[in-house]
């Protein structure tokens, strides 16, 4: 933070700059006696400096619920989102994925879950002014091989999808070099990856998005009905580690999930009738946002092309709502005028 914004005598500010302290945070990292030695200021001057620095960093005023709703609060970073690369989908999620917490994307096969995950891996690399975070992504595959051919197709079509981004910005980004791929076929490997490898990339600023595709696969393979307690324990461990990483590094976590055919009465965390995200209530409690990608089956509407819908099942900042989307060569696009609550 700029030292020139301090409401102090210019003599004190000049002494601070002469001591090669470049920001208010650096001032507050030092004790009063240390500041006296470095700046050669008197004790009263140092106390004035510390109080002014603390006030400037903390800020003033009251933040109301209306300010938060209008995104006018004193902490604008809490409103920052990762864009999905489509204005219609961003409008559905009020800007995109939140940076703190786990977002789940569940859905049937061929609904476009992996397509949207790949699109986010490219969107995160754009500068913040264009909805990105200016960093790469970690993509953890747990069942299928990484879809590299589709990724290359999306990279080649970025200018068509993101017409809002100047061409010279897109051309400077080496999209394929900033997606770090890991394979984890079992729960132990997945936990090891999340605990040891992913934090290194996040700490170095090389990645700001974590994708797990899919979270259900290793748990379905290793745990049968007799080991539900152990499965719940491992799910809790995975969820806690992902939430810790997301909050510590201000990085969104996207977990792709499978669905099961629901034969019992609909519950509060399930999706539309007949579909329920896998892993049950234990996993649902780890999530901040649950999205459901639904694809209409050919037998449900044989005379029309299969339709796709993205639904908000639950989120603390979003109402239950949905919109239709299509998948083209350039990526996933929401259909204008199809949003509903």
UniProtKB/Swiss-Prot annotation:
ATP binds at residues 107-114. One of its GO terms (molecular function) is ATP-dependent DNA damage sensor activity. SUPFAM superfamilies: P-loop containing nucleoside triphosphate hydrolases. InterPro entries: DNA_recomb/repair_Rad51_C (IPR013632), DNA_recomb/repair_RecA-like (IPR016467), P-loop_NTPase (IPR027417), RecA_ATP-bd (IPR020588), XRCC3-like_C (IPR047348). GO terms for biological process: double-strand break repair via homologous recombination; double-strand break repair via synthesis-dependent strand annealing; positive regulation of mitotic cell cycle spindle assembly checkpoint; regulation of centrosome duplication; resolution of mitotic recombination intermediates; t-circle formation; telomere maintenance via recombination. The modification N-acetylmethionine is found at residue 1. PROSITE patterns: RECA_2 (PS50162). It is found in: Nucleus; Cytoplasm; Cytoplasm, Perinuclear region; Mitochondrion matrix. GO terms for cellular component: cytoplasm; mitochondrial matrix; nucleus; perinuclear region of cytoplasm; Rad51C-XRCC3 complex; replication fork. Keywords: Acetylation, ATP-binding, Cytoplasm, DNA damage, DNA recombination, DNA repair, DNA-binding, Mitochondrion, Nucleotide-binding, Nucleus. Involved in the homologous recombination repair (HRR) pathway of double-stranded DNA, thought to repair chromosomal fragmentation, translocations and deletions. Part of the RAD21 paralog protein complex CX3 which acts in the BRCA1-BRCA2-dependent HR pathway. Upon DNA damage, CX3 acts downstream of RAD51 recruitment; the complex binds predominantly to the intersection of the four duplex arms of the Holliday junction (HJ) and to junctions of replication forks. Interacts with RAD51C and RAD51. Part of the CX3 complex consisting of RAD51C and XRCC3; the complex has a ring-like structure arranged into a flat disc around a central channel; CX3 can interact with RAD51 in vitro. Forms a complex with FANCD2, BRCA2 and phosphorylated FANCG. Interacts with SWSAP1 and ZSWIM7; involved in homologous recombination repair. Interacts directly with PALB2 which may serve as a scaffold for a HR complex containing PALB2, BRCA2, RAD51C, RAD51 and XRCC3. Belongs to the RecA family. RAD51 subfamily. This is DNA repair protein XRCC3.
């Amino acid at each position: 933070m700029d030292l020139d914004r301090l409401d102090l005598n210019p003599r004190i500010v000049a002494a601070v700059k002469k001591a090669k302290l470049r920001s208010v945070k650096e001032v507050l990292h030092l004790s009063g006696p240390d500041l006296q030695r470095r700046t050669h200021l008197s004790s009263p001057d140092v106390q004035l400096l510390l109080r002014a620095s603390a006030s400037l960093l903390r800020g003033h005023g009251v933040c109301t619920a209306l300010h938060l709703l209008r995104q006018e609060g004193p902490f604008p970073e809490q409103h920052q989102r990762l864009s999905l690369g489509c204005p219609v989908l961003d409008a559905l999620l009020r800007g995109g994925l939140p940076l703190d917490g786990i977002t789940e994307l569940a859905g049937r096969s061929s609904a476009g879950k992996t397509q949207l995950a790949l699109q986010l891996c490219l969107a995160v690399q754009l500068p913040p002014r264009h909805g990105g975070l200016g960093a790469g992504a970690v993509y953890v595959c747990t069942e299928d091989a990484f879809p590299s051919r589709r990724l290359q197709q999306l990279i080649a079509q970025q200018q068509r999808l993101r017409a809002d981004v100047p061409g010279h910005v897109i051309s400077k980004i080496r999209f394929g070099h900033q997606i770090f791929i890991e394979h984890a076929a079992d729960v132990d490997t997945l936990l090891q990856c999340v605990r040891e490898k992913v934090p290194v990339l996040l700490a170095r600023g090389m990645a700001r998005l974590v994708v797990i595709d899919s979270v259900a696969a290793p748990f379905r393979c290793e745990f049968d009905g007799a080991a539900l307690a152990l499965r719940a324990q491992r799910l809790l461990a995975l969820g806690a580690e992902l939430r810790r990483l997301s909050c510590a590094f201000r990085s969104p976590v996207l977990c792709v999930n499978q669905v099961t055919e629901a034969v019992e009465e609909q519950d509060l965390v399930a999706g539309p009738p007949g579909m329920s995200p896998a892993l049950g209530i234990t996993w649902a409690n780890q999530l901040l946002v649950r999205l459901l990608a639904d694809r209409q089956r050919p037998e449900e509407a044989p005379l029309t092309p299969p339709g796709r819908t993205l639904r908000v099942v639950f989120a603390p900042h979003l109402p239950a709502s949905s919109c239709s989307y299509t998948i083209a060569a350039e990526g996933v696009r929401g259909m204008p005028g199809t949003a509903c609550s």
